[in-house]
Amino acid sequence: MSFNHFDDQGRAIMVDVSGKQPTLRTATAAATVAMKPETLADLLAGRTTKGDVLGVARLAGIAAAKKTPELIPLSHPLAIHHAAVDFETEPETGTITVKATVRAFERTGVEMEAMTSAAVAALTIYDMCKGADKGITIGDICLLFKEGGKSGTWQREEPA
C-alpha cells in the first residue's frame, strides 16, 4: 500500500492532479447523531430554543463542503457543482443519520468534501441540542458511495 500524499523523502505534498482529465465526480457520506428519544422528539416538533436545527445543520454541511480545503490541508480546492444534506430520523432510538452528497466536474474526487459536510452537519446538530442533552454522540462518519475518476464506482457493502 502506498500513500500518495508523501514525496520520496517522506514529506507531505499535495498530489499533482494537473495531468488528469476532469470527469464528473460524486460522493455520498454519512454521520450518525444519537440522542435521547425525547430530545429528538422536541427537535422534530420544533420545540428547541435555537430554532430550525436540521435547517441550520443542512446549511452548515453545505458550507463545509465548500470550505474543505481550508480544513483538510492537502485536499484540493474544487469548484463544487452540487452539495446536498439530508436527514433520516429514527424517533424511537433518538438517531439522526446525516447524508451528504457532493458533485463536481473535476480532476480529483469529492469524498473529503462529502465527509466534511456530513461531519459538520452532525456537529451543528450537537451544538444546537447540547443544552437539552449533554449525552449526544456523533459516530460512524463514513463514505457510502463514490463515482468517477480512474478508480470508478465504489459502494459501501455493509450498513454504516
UniProtKB/Swiss-Prot annotation:
Q: How does the record describe its quaternary structure?
A: Homohexamer; trimer of dimers.
| Highest classification ranks of the organism | Bacteria, Pseudomonadati, Thermodesulfobacteriota, Desulfuromonadia, Geobacterales
Give binding positions for substrate: L74, S75, H76, M112, E113
**Catalytic activity annotation:** (8S)-3',8-cyclo-7,8-dihydroguanosine 5'-triphosphate = cyclic pyranopterin phosphate + diphosphate
What NCBIfam families does this protein map onto? Answer: moaC (TIGR00581), PRK09364.1 (NF006870)
Chain's role: Catalyzes the conversion of (8S)-3',8-cyclo-7,8-dihydroguanosine 5'-triphosphate to cyclic pyranopterin monophosphate (cPMP).
Query: Which sites are catalytic?
Result: D127
Matches recorded under InterPro entries: MoaC, MoaC_bact/euk, MoaC_sf, MoCo_biosynth_MoaA/MoaC, Mopterin_CF_biosynth-C_dom
Q: Does the keyword Lyase apply?
A: yes
**What keywords does the record list, in alphabetical order?**
Lyase, Molybdenum cofactor biosynthesis
EC number(s): the record gives 4.6.1.17
GO MF terms held by the record:
cyclic pyranopterin monophosphate synthase activity
Keyword RNA-binding in record: no
Q: Pfam families in the record, alphabetically? A: MoaC (PF01967)
Q: In which pathway does it act?
A: Cofactor biosynthesis; molybdopterin biosynthesis
Q: Which organism is it from?
A: Geobacter metallireducens (strain ATCC 53774 / DSM 7210 / GS-15)
Q: What name does UniProt use for this protein?
A: Cyclic pyranopterin monophosphate synthase
User: Which Gene3D superfamilies would you find in this protein's record?
Assistant: Molybdopterin cofactor biosynthesis C (MoaC) domain
> Coiled-coil stretches, from where to where?
none
Similarity comment: family membership: Belongs to the MoaC family.
Q: Which GO terms describe its biological process?
A: Mo-molybdopterin cofactor biosynthetic process
**Enzyme's top EC category:** lyase
